[in-house]
């Protein structure tokens, strides 16, 4: 699928929201991409992950890992298509870690996934977990890079959509100055 088809998919599933949003990064934005609204449809999740899997099918990935909650479905479906394990990290006392008996064996090839990448903060936390377990990060994959291609994670990044969606520091946010109420739609509690 091409970029326009993916954007239309987000519109058709009401996953492209407009308003005043507090992002997981702490920044503010007038647009928010709620990938869960797309991924709730198994056929769309399969299609998205099939397109992503094409880029990694020859890399012998052992594990796909992403942060809970946003990347759990993405990680699972991508791992299913790559015929490997899927695990996720989650926050405990504000720190991202592996729980539920999940682990990464030394030397395992790991694909890190996130639904939407803005600053890459959650992805960097996952990369650190992989390094702690002595796994090998092969690449990072996502549905949307909303940094416009500016985020550098130190590993190859493959997303289906690269968009430049303006974000604001809270103290510089024009939406705050206009008094527009802010909404925090994501899963991370700050």
From Swiss-Prot:
<dbReference type="InterPro" id="IPR023031">
    <property type="entry name" value="OPRT"/>
</dbReference>
<dbReference type="GO" id="GO:0044205">
    <property type="term" value="P:'de novo' UMP biosynthetic process"/>
</dbReference>
<keyword id="KW-0460">Magnesium</keyword>
<dbReference type="InterPro" id="IPR006273">
    <property type="entry name" value="Orotate_PRibTrfase_bac"/>
</dbReference>
<comment type="function">
    <text>Catalyzes the transfer of a ribosyl phosphate group from 5-phosphoribose 1-diphosphate to orotate, leading to the formation of orotidine monophosphate (OMP).</text>
</comment>
<dbReference type="InterPro" id="IPR029057">
    <property type="entry name" value="PRTase-like"/>
</dbReference>
<dbReference type="GO" id="GO:0019856">
    <property type="term" value="P:pyrimidine nucleobase biosynthetic process"/>
</dbReference>
<keyword id="KW-0328">Glycosyltransferase</keyword>
<comment type="pathway">
    <text>Pyrimidine metabolism; UMP biosynthesis via de novo pathway; UMP from orotate: step 1/2.</text>
</comment>
<feature type="binding site">
    <location>
        <begin position="114"/>
        <end position="122"/>
    </location>
    <ligand>
        <name>5-phospho-alpha-D-ribose 1-diphosphate</name>
    </ligand>
</feature>
<keyword id="KW-0808">Transferase</keyword>
<dbReference type="GO" id="GO:0000287">
    <property type="term" value="F:magnesium ion binding"/>
</dbReference>
<dbReference type="Pfam" id="PF00156">
    <property type="entry name" value="Pribosyltran"/>
</dbReference>
<comment type="subunit">
    <text>Homodimer.</text>
</comment>
<feature type="binding site">
    <location>
        <position position="118"/>
    </location>
    <ligand>
        <name>orotate</name>
    </ligand>
</feature>
<dbReference type="InterPro" id="IPR000836">
    <property type="entry name" value="PRibTrfase_dom"/>
</dbReference>
<comment type="similarity">
    <text>Belongs to the purine/pyrimidine phosphoribosyltransferase family. PyrE subfamily.</text>
</comment>
<dbReference type="GO" id="GO:0004588">
    <property type="term" value="F:orotate phosphoribosyltransferase activity"/>
</dbReference>
<keyword id="KW-0665">Pyrimidine biosynthesis</keyword>
<feature type="binding site">
    <location>
        <position position="146"/>
    </location>
    <ligand>
        <name>orotate</name>
    </ligand>
</feature>
<protein>
    <recommendedName>
        <fullName>Orotate phosphoribosyltransferase</fullName>
        <ecNumber>2.4.2.10</ecNumber>
    </recommendedName>
</protein>
């Amino acid at each position: 699928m091409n970029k326009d088809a993916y954007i239309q998919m987000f519109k058709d599933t009401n996953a492209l929201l407009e308003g005043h949003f507090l992002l997981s990064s702490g920044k503010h934005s007038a647009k928010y991409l709620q990938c869960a609204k797309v991924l709730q449809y198994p056929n769309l999740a399969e299609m998205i992950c099939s397109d992503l899997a094409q880029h990694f099918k020859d890399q012998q990935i052992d594990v796909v890992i992403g942060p809970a909650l946003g990347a759990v479905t993405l990680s699972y479906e991508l791992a299913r298509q790559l015929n490997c394990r899927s695990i996720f990290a989650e926050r405990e006392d504000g720190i991202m870690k592996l729980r539920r008996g999940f682990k990464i064996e030394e030397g395992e090839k790991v694909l890190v996934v996130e639904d939407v990448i803005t600053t890459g903060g959650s992805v960097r936390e996952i990369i650190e977990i992989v390094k702690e377990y002595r796994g090998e990060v092969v690449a990072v994959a996502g549905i949307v890079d909303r940094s416009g291609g500016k985020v550098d994670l130190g590993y190859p990044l493959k997303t289906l959509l690269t968009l430049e969606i303006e974000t604001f520091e809270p103290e510089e946010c024009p939406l705050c100055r206009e008094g527009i109420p802010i909404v925090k739609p994501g899963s991370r509690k700050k």
